[in-house]
């Protein structure tokens, strides 16, 4: 009997102290939000292949131009005060050196482009979004090594 009690107690303590248990506030979704309720088991899922908002600089199209068709575009949201972003920036430089002109890397400073970050629902930094043909292919809301990014981009080239 003592063995069963010990096992149950050990399992209970192990669950709360070994596994990362987080609490999140339930948020209602809107049509612009990429997170939508899926079913009663999965609270949210990322709706992939979502059309992206129009990006412009000084009145000219950056992404929606004809020359960007079938080009993989990497949006990298960062901030100068973010320590993980400084590590991610070196990985993004490696990515740019590896692919050269085969991809289009667009670095977006969060402090200067808050409205754009809201359009893409950026909640954490660094955030990396892969786009192709005005469609979101993948999204990473954390640090990602250059090797993982290279493998992810190879799938879509």
From Swiss-Prot:
Keywords in alphabetical order: Disulfide bond, Electron transport, Membrane, Redox-active center, Signal, Transport
Processing and modification events after translation: The disulfide bond between Cys-82 and Cys-85 acts as a redox-active center and is reduced by thioredoxin reductase TRXR.
Subcellular location(s) of the protein: Parasitophorous vacuole membrane
Domain spans labelled Thioredoxin: 46-157
PROSITE patterns: THIOREDOXIN_2
Single GO molecular function: protein-disulfide reductase activity
Active site, UniProt feature: 82, 85
Disulfide cross-links: 82-85
Keyword Acetylation carried by entry: no
Record has Transmembrane as a keyword: no
Record's GO cellular component terms: cytoplasm; membrane; mitochondrion; PTEX complex; symbiont-containing vacuole; symbiont-containing vacuole membrane
Major localization listed first in the record, in broad terms: membrane
Signal peptide range in chain numbering: 1-23
Membrane topology: Peripheral membrane protein
Subunit structure: Monomer. Component of the Plasmodium translocon of exported proteins (PTEX) complex composed of HSP101, EXP2, PTEX150, PTEX88 and TRX2.
Task performed by this protein: Participates in various redox reactions through the reversible oxidation of its active center dithiol to a disulfide and catalyzes dithiol-disulfide exchange reactions. As part of the translocon PTEX complex, plays a role in the export of parasite proteins into the host erythrocyte. The translocon PTEX complex is a multi-protein machinery resident in the parasite parasitophorous vacuolar membrane, responsible for protein secretion into host cells.
UniProt similarity note: Belongs to the thioredoxin family.
Name this polypeptide is given: Thioredoxin 2
Taxonomic classification: Eukaryota, Sar, Alveolata, Apicomplexa, Aconoidasida
Gene that this polypeptide is encoded by: TRX2
């Amino acid at each position: 009997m003592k063995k069963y009690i010990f096992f149950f107690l050990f399992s209970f303590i192990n669950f709360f102290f070994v596994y990362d248990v987080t609490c999140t506030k339930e948020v209602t979704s809107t049509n612009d939000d990429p997170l939508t309720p899926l079913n009663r088991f999965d609270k949210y899922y990322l709706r992939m292949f979502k059309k992206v908002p129009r990006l412009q600089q000084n009145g000219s199209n950056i992404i929606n131009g004809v020359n960007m068709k079938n080009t993989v575009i990497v949006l990298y949201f960062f901030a100068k005060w973010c320590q993980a972003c400084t590590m991610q920036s070196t990985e993004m430089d490696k990515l740019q050196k590896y692919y050269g002109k085969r991809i289009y890397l667009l670095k977006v400073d969060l402090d200067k482009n808050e409205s754009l970050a809201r359009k893409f629902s950026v909640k954490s930094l660094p955030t990396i979004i892969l786009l192709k043909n005005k469609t979101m292919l993948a999204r990473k809301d954390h640090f990602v090594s250059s090797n993982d990014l290279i493998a992810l981009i190879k799938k879509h080239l």
